[in-house]
Amino acid sequence: MSVKHFIQITKPGIIFGNVLSVAGGFFLASKGHVDFALFLAVVIGTSLVVASGCVFNNCIDRDIDHKMERTKNRVMVQGGMSLPLALIYATLLGVAGFSLLYVQANPLSAFCALIGFVVYVGFYSLWLKRKSVHGTLVGSLSGAMPPVIGYCAVSNSFDLAAVTLLVMFSLWQMPHSFAIAIFRFKDYSAANIPVLPVARGILAAKKQIVLYVLAFVLATLMLTLGGYAGLGYLAVAAAMGLYWLYMAWGGYKAEDDSKWARKVFGFSILTVTALSVMMGVDSQTAADVLMTYAR
């Protein structure tokens, strides 16, 4: 056991992705007036909570991870960390993360983090992931919480913008996850995990990807229409979303489903990254947007 194992078991890639969306929500609410001490506390606190959830997930999934090519070398599978130590580590990470958000930000942001944590560890990892084709849908709520945490840490209000962020990122999670399930079809099938492509077929997953991307595109526009983001954000959201939709629609003609799914997955990351950046650099008050429309 080494320091490397303590880092790997937290899934750094997932933490980094969540930091981007946390920052997007935080800067959206800040509207150009950034409290960098608060920002640092929110990023670290959320990262610790996400890390805790990932370690608990590793503990829960250790019996199926060895069946999947992409997870067979995880720390728990390879015996790099004992279960008791991993559980203690996960608990300490969680306590530290929730405490930091509660004390340095506000109870609302900590509560949002708690909801995401409970959904991911309890409802998704412990239950629905192995039992239901709808596990991805429920799990998407946890993946959508980081930008909401960032937003609420500043605004201390669960308003229309927070709801929009929750809907946006939940919708984004679905085609993103379905694409992974398609190009990792053999892994999920071997582990008997009832993701949509395995349970109902790849064609059914393609249809759902198109529908969810379309819904996502419409949801992204609401930040500008609701008066929270500017026209620059709107232009980027529309361009990225429509191209992602075009790419998703191409799945009906794809000769290689795995190759197509990897492209959809890759562009999903580019899309959410671009939107997170634009939320931060082009946030506006409702009055600003209304004045722009009135000119």
Swiss-Prot record:
It catalyses: heme b + (2E,6E)-farnesyl diphosphate + H2O = Fe(II)-heme o + diphosphate. GO terms for cellular component: plasma membrane. One of its GO terms (molecular function) is protoheme IX farnesyltransferase activity. It is an enzyme of class 2 (transferase). Coiled coil: none annotated. PROSITE patterns: UBIA. Keywords: Cell inner membrane, Cell membrane, Heme biosynthesis, Membrane, Transferase, Transmembrane, Transmembrane helix. Pfam families: UbiA (PF01040). Pathway: Porphyrin-containing compound metabolism; heme O biosynthesis; heme O from protoheme: step 1/1. It is a multi-pass membrane protein. The chain crosses the membrane at residues 9-29, 36-56, 83-103, 108-128, 135-155, 163-183, 209-229, 230-250, 264-284. It is found in: Cell inner membrane. Belongs to the UbiA prenyltransferase family. Protoheme IX farnesyltransferase subfamily. Carbon 2 of the heme B porphyrin ring is defined according to the Fischer nomenclature. This is Protoheme IX farnesyltransferase 2. The lineage of its organism: Bacteria, Pseudomonadati, Pseudomonadota, Gammaproteobacteria, Pseudomonadales.
